């Protein structure tokens, strides 16, 4: 007899309102309560609060719940600065006082290291910048609303593809925020507005950059309107008709300064969004490395040379390794433009075996890593085998930092300093820096 597949029925969710006590924050900034010894994650709730919740997801190991109301509020709660806060998917901690965000992130960093059995050494003061007007980069989503024939212009809603219409963003630098209203008006006047993909705004040290992604060519009138708009406001304009095609239409080539070094970039390239914190981060990393003129330094995940180029001004040689070849080529050009002949850049996938690479058998006295959220598991064995005196690890994910730290410690390194970087105020994102010494 044929057997027919019967899908399992989805477990029903208990939607009855329930009162819980919030005890702490998770690493993304959600409140955690416990019901029948199982953690319940509640977006928008703070430790010390009594919350009325409604379950939206119940699994064997954990549950998620919606915050209905607060029966008891934390004294650390504040009114969010942004009118779009409860819809927009950008910030998720504006309801917590900024100084308490720092405390919570510091505690989370230490907790994750302890959980992995990593002895943390000295906990240094966090690197901080402005609480607001700190983001020098924004990606603005666009969608033609067929009912109104107007563009939805703003940021994605939380856990949704829908767009929150935004004309002011308090965490954007003022130089970019001031253009949102007029840019919305301009784009809505274009005949080809239905062919728009998204817009990116980037603040360089030599001007504001506007990138427009479009899926069909602009007619002559639309293109001239864009150029006129940028000329009136002295904006650097790029058009992107395809994902891998970038046309520089007007303005200078953008750059930012770090430690007196000009780093040129395109709006496709990764740069740190927080200028102030980035400058302090580079300064601290160079200080922790305790550099001298005879040092040879390996910079892994080097990007455009954010660390490599300032390093090259202080040591004998620097080798930078980056996975994206376009950024490697720009890093080389940046070195030439800054007349730095003692730095070399190579392309390599640092998630794969690298022991056969030429640089992997070179003697380095110091190593710096700045990997993406996935961490540097693929290259940590090589780092340890190179036996540098010092390793500085800059991390945007404390969980992978804690994991990768274990391997260095197994090879005789000690974690001597650890510090948090407040790169993204009002969000759950946690950047950190760790110093390992042999």
Curated annotation (Swiss-Prot):
Binding site for S-adenosyl-L-methionine: 272, 301, 306, 322, 349, 370
EC number assigned by the record: 2.1.1.190
Catalytic reaction(s) noted: uridine(1939) in 23S rRNA + S-adenosyl-L-methionine = 5-methyluridine(1939) in 23S rRNA + S-adenosyl-L-homocysteine + H(+)
Keyword set includes Cell inner membrane: no
Active site: 396 (nucleophile)
Domain TRAM: 10-69
InterPro entries: 23S_rRNA_MeTrfase_RlmD, MeTrfase_TrmA_AS, MeTrfase_TrmA_CS, NA-bd_OB-fold, SAM-dependent_MTases_sf, TRAM_dom, U5_MeTrfase_fam
Family (UniProt): Belongs to the class I-like SAM-binding methyltransferase superfamily. RNA M5U methyltransferase family. RlmD subfamily.
Listed name of the protein: 23S rRNA (uracil(1939)-C(5))-methyltransferase RlmD
Originating species: Aliivibrio fischeri (strain ATCC 700601 / ES114) (Vibrio fischeri)
């Amino acid at each position: 007899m044929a057997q027919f597949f019967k899908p399992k029925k989805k477990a029903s969710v208990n939607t009855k309102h329930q009162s819980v006590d919030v005890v702490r924050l998770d690493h993304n900034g959600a409140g955690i309560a416990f019901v029948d010894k199982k953690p319940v994650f509640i977006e928008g709730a703070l430790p010390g609060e009594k919350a009325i919740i409604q379950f939206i997801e119940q699994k064997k190991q954990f549950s998620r719940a919606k915050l209905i109301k607060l029966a008891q509020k934390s004294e650390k709660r504040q009114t969010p600065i942004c009118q779009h806060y409860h819809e927009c998917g950008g910030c998720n901690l504006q309801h917590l006082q900024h100084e308490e965000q720092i405390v919570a992130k510091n505690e989370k960093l230490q907790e994750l290291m302890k959980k992995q059995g990593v002895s943390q050494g000295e906990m240094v003061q966090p690197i901080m910048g402005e609480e607001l007007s700190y983001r020098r980069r924004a990606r603005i989503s666009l969608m033609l609303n067929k009912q109104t024939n107007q563009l939805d212009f703003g940021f994605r809603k939380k856990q949704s593809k829908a767009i929150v219409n935004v004309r002011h963003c308090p965490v954007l630098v003022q130089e970019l925020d001031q253009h949102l209203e007029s840019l919305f008006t301009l784009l809505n006047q274009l005949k080809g507005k239905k062919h728009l993909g998204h817009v990116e705004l980037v603040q360089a040290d030599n001007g504001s950059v506007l990138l427009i992604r479009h899926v069909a060519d602009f007619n002559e009138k639309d293109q001239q309107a864009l150029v006129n708009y940028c000329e009136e406001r002295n904006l650097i304009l790029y058009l992107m008709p395809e994902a891998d095609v970038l046309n520089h239409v007007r303005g200078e080539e953008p750059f930012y300064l770090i430690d007196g070094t000009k780093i040129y970039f395109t709006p496709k390239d990764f740069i740190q969004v927080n200028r102030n914190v980035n400058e302090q981060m580079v300064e601290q990393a160079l200080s922790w490395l305790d550099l001298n003129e005879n040092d040879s330094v390996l910079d892994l995940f080097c990007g455009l040379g954010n660390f490599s180029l300032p390093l090259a001004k202080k040591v004998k040689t620097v080798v930078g390794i980056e996975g994206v070849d376009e950024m490697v080529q720009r890093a080389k050009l940046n070195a030439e433009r800054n007349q730095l002949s003692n730095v070399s850049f190579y392309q390599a996938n640092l998630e794969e075996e690298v022991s056969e690479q030429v640089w992997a058998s070179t003697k380095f006295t110091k190593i710096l890593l700045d990997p993406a959220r996935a961490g540097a598991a693929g290259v940590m064995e090589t780092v340890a085998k190179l036996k540098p005196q010092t390793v500085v690890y800059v991390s945007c994910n404390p969980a992978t930092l804690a994991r990768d730290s274990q391997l260095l410690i197994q090879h005789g390194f000690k974690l001597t300093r650890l510090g948090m970087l407040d790169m993204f105020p009002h969000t759950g994102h946690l950047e950190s820096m760790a110093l390992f010494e042999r």
